[in-house]
């Protein structure tokens, strides 16, 4: 069976608490069943109280953290041109990087491309 979870705020918690993504007290549960696939959207939540510079900084810190944790945990962070068919045919655990609050763009249109290059596939405004 394939599982697709569209939203998980654990990334924000792990980054701000400087903890591991698979901390047992968090919501993340890795798929250990070789016959199923799990695609998780990891959302970095950016509080409205942050100014644009702070939100942008937290975004880039979170992007580095997610990449590192995906490598450590064997999660395939899907990039440009990779979609759910790849996730469900090739990888047991895969991820999309998402952003909850467009303030992370910090008013810089060039950040749209930069975010996409870092794997962002969904962003709320």
Model-derived segments and spans:
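N-terminal hydrophobic targeting/anchoring segments and the immediately downstream early-domain regions
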Residues: 1-125
């Amino acid at each position: 069976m394939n599982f697709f979870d569209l939203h998980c705020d654990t990334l924000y918690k792990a980054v701000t608490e400087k903890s591991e993504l698979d901390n047992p007290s968090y919501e993340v549960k890795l798929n250990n069943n070789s016959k199923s696939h799990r695609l998780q959207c990891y959302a970095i939540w950016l509080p409205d109280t942050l100014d644009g510079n702070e939100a942008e900084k937290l975004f880039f810190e979170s992007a580095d953290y997610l990449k590192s944790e995906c490598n450590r945990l064997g999660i395939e962070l899907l990039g440009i041109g990779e979609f759910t068919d790849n996730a469900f045919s090739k990888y047991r655990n895969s991820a999309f990087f998402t952003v909850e609050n467009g303030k992370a763009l910090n008013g810089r249109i060039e950040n749209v491309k930069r975010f996409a290059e870092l794997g962002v596939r969904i962003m709320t405004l």
